[in-house]
Amino acid sequence: MTQTSVDARPAPIDPRGPRFAASVTALLLLVGTFFALTGAATRTGTTLGERLADPGFWVLLIVDLLFVWGFTSPRTAPWGVLFRSLIRPRLAPPADLEDPRPPRFAQIVGFTVVTVGLVLHVAGVPWALPVAGAAAFVAAFLNAAFAFCLGCQLYLGLARVGVIRPRGGLAAT
C-alpha cells in the first residue's frame, strides 16, 4: 500500500514539454504583437469598438486563455497533449526531469502580463497591448531558444526568500 501525502512533491515532468509549449506560445505571441503593432493598439483616441476589433487583441486573448488552460489543467493543455502524444514518443528519454511547479508558475506570470496588456488596451491605453505581448514573447522565446525560463527563475527566487512555500520543498538545484 502506498501512502500519499499532501506535502509530497508533484511528479516530475519532461523539461522538453514546457520548452515545446514555449516555442508555440512564442510564435503566437509574436503574431499577436505584430497585429497589435499594426492595429488600433498604438493609436490614441480609438473607440472601444476599434480596440475590440484589433486582431492583436484577439490573438493575445487566445494566448491568454491558453495560459489559463496551462496553469489550471496542465495535463489537458493543448501544447502538452501535442508534445506527449506526437513529439515525446519520437525522442530519447530525457536526461533529467523537473519539478512542474515552476513552469506552472511561469504560465501564471505570462497570463498576468498579457492580461494587464489586454485590460489596459480595452481601457484605451495606447501601446499597452504590444508592450505586454512583446514582454511575454521575450520570456517565451528565452525559454524556447535557450532553456531559460524567466517565470521559473522568478518562482525559485520567491521560494528561496519564503514568499512562496512549495509543499514538499524545492528540489536541490
For each feature predicted by the language model, list its residue ranges.
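Membrane-interfacial helix-loop segments of redox and metal-homeostasis proteins
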Residues: 1-173
